[in-house]
């Protein structure tokens, strides 16, 4: 890898409007995260560009369409296309969400929450194991942002996610913005959630921005990925890495995309916190903070 200016754990989401910039200018990052479904067509222009960029960057494949919570199972054609992409790119991480978005062949344009019950847990774990068997690797499961919850849930989201990890040996993608947004929407404490998640199983952290929407009943916070990372989420990140150490960290920005320089400035903020934490935890070994 020739891109060594940023700490190697810091990456950004590669979105199609930024393709040309990354392809031609190669900002000095070690890795990029893609939305897997955007690259299922092997002969598309953007897939060919990605193949060339993969010679200079590590790639993480982040899915939004496996619908791992669907009782009917994972769509076999979707899984086949994902497997072909993973086999071709050999990404260093593959991830999807603790959610569902398909039922009986009908697809919803959102990542919908699960009821946190034993039945839903069995379905979700069965689907994760099926995907991991097909890909021949563990996948990362990301905690969702949510705006409603089911009255018949019997355990918390963090208990559900922890049990998924235990039963499937999957890895975890900890989205700190999602924790913060859901904590406000549902009235739980962020620290309760974060302390319950097995840190040793977290391989990646997502950082993003959110939007506040006013309703007649009050405010709702929405994980829009259209804003800079909030000060409160930066604080959660700083606290988490101080306690648990460095992880691959992604700046996620999907809507109202800014210029690439704005995205890289957010990445630089993450890097500054990460290097400071590494240096603080290893004061006699400053080289650890140099990447």
UniProtKB/Swiss-Prot annotation:
Disulfide bond entries: none
Domain of life: Bacteria
Signal peptide: none
Pfam families, per database record: MbnB_TglH_ChrH
InterPro entries assigned to the protein according to its UniProt record, in alphabetical order: MbnB/TglH/ChrH, Xyl_isomerase-like_sf
Family: Belongs to the UPF0276 family.
Name of protein: UPF0276 protein VV3194
Protein species of origin: Vibrio vulnificus (strain YJ016)
């Amino acid at each position: 890898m020739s891109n060594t200016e940023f700490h190697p754990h810091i990456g950004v989401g590669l979105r199609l409007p930024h393709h040309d910039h990354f392809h031609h200018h190669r900002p000095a990052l070690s890795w990029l995260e893609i939305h897997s479904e955007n690259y299922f067509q092997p002969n598309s222009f953007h897939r060919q560009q990605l193949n060339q960029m993969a010679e200079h960057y590590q790639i993480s494949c982040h899915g939004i369409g496996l619908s791992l919570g669907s009782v009917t199972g994972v769509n076999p054609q979707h899984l086949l296309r994902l497997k072909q992409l993973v086999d071709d790119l050999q990404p260093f991480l593959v991830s999807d969400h603790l959610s569902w978005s398909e039922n009986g062949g009908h697809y919803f344009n959102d990542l919908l929450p699960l009821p946190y019950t034993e039945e839903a847990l069995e379905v979700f774990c069965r689907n994760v194991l099926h995907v991991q068997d097909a890909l021949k690797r563990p996948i990362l499961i990301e905690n969702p942002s949510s705006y409603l919850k089911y009255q018949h849930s019997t355990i918390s989201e963090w208990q559900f996610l922890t049990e998924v990890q235990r039963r499937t040996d999957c890895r975890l993608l900890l989205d700190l913005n999602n924790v913060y947004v859901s904590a406000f929407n549902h009235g739980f404490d962020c620290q309760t959630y974060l302390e319950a998640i097995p840190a040793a199983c977290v391989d990646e952290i997502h950082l993003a921005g959110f939007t506040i929407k006013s309703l007649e009943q009050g405010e709702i916070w929405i994980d829009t990925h259209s804003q800079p990372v909030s000060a409160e989420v930066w604080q959660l990140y700083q606290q988490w890495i101080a306690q648990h150490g460095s992880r691959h960290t992604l700046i996620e920005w999907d809507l109202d995309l800014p210029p690439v320089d704005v995205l890289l400035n957010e990445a630089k903020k993450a890097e500054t916190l990460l290097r400071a934490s590494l240096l603080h935890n290893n004061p006699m070994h400053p080289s650890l903070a140099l990447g």
